A protein has these predicted regions:
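Cell-envelope/extracellular polymer assembly enzymes that use nucleotide-activated donors
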Residues: 3-5, 30
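Short, conserved active-site loop motifs that form the nucleotide-linked donor/cofactor pocket
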Residues: 4, 51-52, 107
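Conserved donor nucleotide-binding strand/loop of the catalytic core
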Residues: 29, 43-74
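Catalytic-site signature of metal-activated, phosphate-bearing donor transferases
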Residues: 61-68, 75-81, 88-158
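A conserved acidic beta->alpha catalytic loop
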Residues: 23, 35-44
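Short, well-formed alpha-helical segments that are part of the catalytic scaffolds
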Residues: 8-27
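Catalytic metal- and UDP-sugar-binding loop of GT-A-like glycosyltransferases, i.e.
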Residues: 56, 81-83
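Conserved SAM-binding loop
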Residues: 3, 10, 14, 38-41
């Protein structure tokens, strides 16, 4: 059975963080917030739901680079989520199965489908459905060096 650390970068996400954590905690062995010194209740809410909170004033990319170094990761996989994202129960189960199936393979990342929502409703036009690399093995991926819309990129494997 493979293990998963969920990593959620945050800054003032007290309106979103509880639902995000609740949506992924059934498959998470560890939930870690990389918080950019939130001034709202993000930290307290996350901790009350069992998440570890690491606060720093470092940039987004620098916080992601801390994984495996200053912040040890001893699980098989990392699931990266934004605080305004949710896993459905079905997608959580599917993700866990995929992680278990590929734990010992040369598969270093899993591309996830996502659906755009607005005001609580699915969008059904344009780029409403997409795919992003969101699950990867520790040390096998990095965050692009971009100002906006950065992506996770695999270092090796598939």
């Amino acid at each position: 059975m493979s293990t998963i650390t969920v990593v959620i970068p945050t800054y003032n996400e007290d309106k979103n963080i509880a639902e995000c954590i609740i949506s992924c905690r059934d498959i998470a062995d560890r939930i870690l917030l990389l918080d950019n010194m939130s001034t709202d209740q993000t930290k307290e809410i996350a901790e009350s739901l069992g998440a570890e909170v690491f606060q720093t004033e470092r940039s987004y990319k620098e916080r992601m680079a801390m994984l495996g170094g200053e912040i040890p990761i001893d699980t098989d996989w990392i699931l990266y989520m934004d605080a305004d994202e949710r896993l459905t129960p079905e997608s959580a189960k599917e993700l866990k199965v995929l992680c278990d199936e590929h734990a010992d393979a040369d598969v270093n990342g899993i591309v996830c489908r996502y659906r755009q929502r607005f005001l609580g409703k699915d969008l059904n036009y344009g780029d409403s459905v997409g795919r992003k690399l969101r699950v990867f093995k520790p040390g096998r991926a990095y965050m692009e060096d971009m100002e906006l819309d950065e992506h996770i990129v695999l270092r090796s494997g598939r």
